[in-house]
Structures are given as structure tokens and as C-alpha cells.
Amino acid sequence: MNLTRRDLAVVGVFALSATPLIVPAMAGTDDEEAVKQAVEALRKAILAQDKATLETLAAEQLSYSHSDAHLEDKTKFINAIMTRRAVFKSLEFPELTIAIAGNNAIVRHLWVSESELDGKVTNTKIGVLQVWQKQGSSWKLLARASFKLPESA
């Protein structure tokens, strides 16, 4: 098969015109993976009481609410983790979904944990909504709200 300059020009024009359609889709996939990694880093940092990682992942404007409506800013959130008396035996974030919306990501998952305080084991299963924001090249946790699940969940 012989390709002419005209054939190559047509292919080139097509390739260049398709780039704006392909690149955002690929960027979304890269961003989803980066957010997924940030969520996993947050889970591990909560378990390990890793203050440096928590400081890095949380946005300065963080609004963190618990299922009992208790609200914390970045400082209170990190201090609560660092001074907690309960020991997490496990913490998982199953049913993770991520939706990229510009420089924001909407993350939903369950919070499934087992913790122990004064010899008493507590199992927790709640729903969580997180909003992550891309600040520079990093994803930061901007907001988090948790909620009680229906009895059947």
C-alpha cells in the first residue's frame, strides 16, 4: 500500500483533531488513580496515626464532620486522631467510587472498622462522602461527611 502526502496529511489532521477528545479522558483516569491513592494514604495514616501524612493530605480549609454531626477543622481532625484512646484493629474503605469534576473529586465509600477501648470492641459501619480538591499537583481532602446507614445496609 502506497501512502501519499495527502493521505498522511489527512491522518495527521484527524489525529490532531482527536487529541482534545482523548487527552481529557486520559487525564480523568490519571486523576482518579491519584485520588484513589490519596484516599488509601488517608486510610493508612488514620490507622497508623501518621501526623505528617495527615498534615500533607488535609487541606487547610478542611471541614470534617462525623456521623453524630460533630464538626472538626484540620487542626481538630489531626489532634483527634493523634490523641485518640481507642485502638483501631482494622479500618477498610469498601465500595469506593470516585467522580472527577474539574479540580474536584467526589468520593464515596463505606467506613468499616473494628476498634477497642478499655477492653470493649466496637464495630462501625457508616457511609462517607469526601470532597478532594487538586491544589497544585496534589489532591487534598477538603471536606468529609459521614452518615449512619439504614439498618438493612
What is the predicted role of each segment?
Residues M1-R6:
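Positively charged n-region of N-terminal signal peptides that target proteins for export
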Residues A9-S17, P24-T56, S63-A153:
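A beta-strand edge to alpha-helix "cap/lid" segment located at domain peripheries
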